[in-house]
A protein has these predicted regions:
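C-terminal regulatory/oligomerization modules of transcriptional regulators
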Residues: 1-8, 81-83
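Short, surface-exposed secondary-structure edge patches
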Residues: 3, 25-32
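Short alpha-helix capping/helix-loop boundary micro-motifs
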Residues: 23-27, 47-48
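C-terminal structural segments of small proteins and small subunits
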Residues: 46, 50-83
Length: 83
C-alpha cells in the first residue's frame, strides 16, 4: 500500500519508497519521511484528490498525490487507529 491509498484519519508506518524515483525520495527524506515513522492522513483535496495533508512527526505536510504514491506504508492495527 502507498500513502496516497491511505484512508483519511488512518495511521500507518512508513515501510520504504518505490524504486526509480531517487530524486523524489531524496526530497521526501529531506522533509522528514523515513522508514519506521508514523504517518496519518488528515485531509484529501476536493479536486483530483490533491493535495493530501498528513501528520508526520508532529508536523502537518501537504503532498501532491503523485508524490505520496512513492511512499510505501503499512497500516497500524485498528486499536492504534482509534486515537
Amino acid at each position: 500500500m502507498t500513502l496516497d491509498q491511505l484512508e483519511r484519519k488512518r495511521k500507518a508506518i512508513i515501510k520504504g519508497f518505490d524504486e526509480g524515483h531517487s530524486e523524489l525520495e531524496i526530497r521526501l527524506r529531506e522533509i522528514g519521511f523515513a522508514e519506521g515513522d508514523s504517518v496519518e492522513t488528515l485531509h484529501v483535496g476536493l479536486f483530483d484528490k490533491n493535495p493530501i495533508s498528513v501528520r508526520l512527526n508532529g508536523a502537518i505536510i501537504a503532498l501532491r498525490r503523485k508524490d505520496a504514491s512513492v511512499i510505501k506504508v503499512g497500516l497500524l492495527s485498528d486499536v492504534e487507529n482509534k486515537d
